[in-house]
Amino acid sequence: MFKTLKHLLALLGLILPLGLAATAQAAEPTRFTVEVRGKGPDVILIPGLASSRDVWAATAKQLEGRYRVHLIQVAGFAGLPAGGNAEGGVVEPLADEIVAYIASRRLDHPAIIGHSMGGFTALLIASHHPESVGRVMVVDALPFFSVLINPESTAETIAPQAAGFRDMVLGQSPEAFAAGQTRTMEGLIKTPAARPQAVAWSLATDRGVMARATYDVMTNDLRGDLAGIKTPVTVLYARDPEMGYVYGIVGLIYESNYAALPGVKLRPVNGAFHFVMLDQREAFAAEVETFRH
């Protein structure tokens, strides 16, 4: 009997390391890569749709002397192969993999700063995995994007329009897509010198990943989850007279859509379009310092 028990224990000793190795391997992200800089409390930076991690270059430089900065690059965006994002949904699986990354690296309630789709992803993590995150900064993103298309939108009513947009992106010729991205960046970035790089990131993005990620953002409504979020959340939003009529109501849009989130801090950044960190670098850096303290 003891001999048999010894053999079982020996076998178990072989199996356990294999199992642990498999678990560690499973925790390796397939939907993003990460570049880690600095030492200290952990801060995760998530870029927006079709953006490179380099959109956070100035922020990473600002923080890396005092914090350990985790720069996310979403698979399929800005030249990175699609990897695990090659098919199916993008945003929710991305959030789940970031949570797995936090757990596997034993990060202690990291702060997360996310822009646009990255901000939505950060909200998703805070609402569905509150144990994983310490605080969140959302940069120019709403809990339900599609209210910007129609304030009465629901996830169900917007789905056909979201599917149509997804299919349009997939069906465009390279020339039409490039022209469209150039026009789009004129409305998203106020600083002309910053636009060409953002356009280049978009053109290097896997269009299938972009289209499906856009569909995800358009059809996922987190407003009903806000009341349950206990994580401290700061929301920065762009505000500029060149936005036209939106300039006068953007504050109300953010206030009404985040009304259910306890203790949310809503902070306008004047003189910026959607890429706040590129248009108002000093103001954005100051907001990051306030957020971290």
PLM region spans:
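Alpha/beta-hydrolase fold catalytic core
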Residues: 1-44, 64-68, 89, 108, ...
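Conserved HGGG/HGGXW glycine-rich cap/lid loop of the alpha/beta-hydrolase fold
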Residues: 35-83
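Active-site loop/oxyanion-hole signature of alpha/beta-hydrolase fold enzymes
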Residues: 37, 70-113, 117, 127
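Short glycine-enriched nucleophile-adjacent loop
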Residues: 119-130, 136
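Flexible "cap/lid" loop of the alpha/beta hydrolase fold
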Residues: 134-171
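Conserved alpha/beta-hydrolase catalytic His-Asp/Glu region
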Residues: 147-148, 153, 168-225
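Conserved loop-alpha-helix segment in the C-terminal half of the alpha/beta-hydrolase fold
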Residues: 232-272
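Catalytic histidine-centered segment of alpha/beta-hydrolase-like enzymes
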Residues: 269-281, 285
